[in-house]
Amino acid sequence: MRILGIDPGLRTTGFGVLERHGHKLVYVASGTIKSNGNADLPSRLKTLYDGVSELVSTYRPDCASIEKVFVNVNPQSTLLLGQARGAVICGLMSGNLPVFEYTALQLKQAVVGYGRANKDQVQEMVVRLLNLEGKPGADASDALGVAICHAHGGETLAAMAGLAPQLAQKGLRVRRGRLVG
């Protein structure tokens, strides 16, 4: 299975492509899509949409995984990030890809084994898990991390998270990937 991971951002959007063969992960590509900070917002969003659409047609992934938005202290920054995510998701959907979303906590737990890991720890584990010769940039590393998260059973985590309301009615919840009462 070929997975396209995305770390969305208005200025810089990271991407990472990997393949899962059984339990083995194979690095395919990574990099960034940059929008012109001097351009108007619609032009920047179109740059992201076009860039992601091109990635989909170039790498032909089976699915995509994307990091969820966190609420920032600055509401304007959160709004802009949400718009960037929207453009990216539309680009992914233009290729009819299934899109899976993961929180930073889920990503860190899947990659490092600790949900409060810092960016350097995530970057180092991405290098180790994919046998990379050098460190990818921070945005590309996060994108590879979200792809690794999906490859390591993220589909199950996403499905369980989607069941949260039904589980809560039964007095259950998901904690650290397990059902608890």
Swiss-Prot record:
Keywords carried by this UniProt record: Cytoplasm, DNA damage, DNA recombination, DNA repair, DNA-binding, Endonuclease, Hydrolase, Magnesium, Metal-binding, Nuclease
* Annotated Mg(2+) 2 binding sites: E67
Could you name the Gene Ontology cellular component terms for this entry? cytoplasm; Holliday junction resolvase complex
What does it catalyze? Endonucleolytic cleavage at a junction such as a reciprocal single-stranded crossover between two homologous DNA duplexes (Holliday junction)
- Tell me which stretches of the chain form a coiled coil: none
Please name the catalytic residues of this protein.
Answer: D7, E67, D139
Instruction: Give binding positions for Mg(2+) 1.
Output: D7, D139
Gene Ontology biological-process annotations = DNA recombination; DNA repair
Question: What cofactor does its activity depend on?
Answer: Mg(2+)
The main place the protein resides is cytoplasm
Q: Give GO terms: molecular function aspect only.
A: crossover junction DNA endonuclease activity; DNA binding; magnesium ion binding
Look up the EC number in the record and give it: 3.1.21.10
Q: What class of enzyme is it?
A: hydrolase
| Summary of the function given for this chain in its UniProt record | The RuvA-RuvB-RuvC complex processes Holliday junction (HJ) DNA during genetic recombination and DNA repair. Endonuclease that resolves HJ intermediates. Cleaves cruciform DNA by making single-stranded nicks across the HJ at symmetrical positions within the homologous arms, yielding a 5'-phosphate and a 3'-hydroxyl group; requires a central core of homology in the junction. The consensus cleavage sequence is 5'-(A/T)TT(C/G)-3'. Cleavage occurs on the 3'-side of the TT dinucleotide at the point of strand exchange.
Give the protein's recorded name.
Crossover junction endodeoxyribonuclease RuvC
List the taxonomic lineage: Bacteria, Pseudomonadati, Pseudomonadota, Betaproteobacteria, Burkholderiales
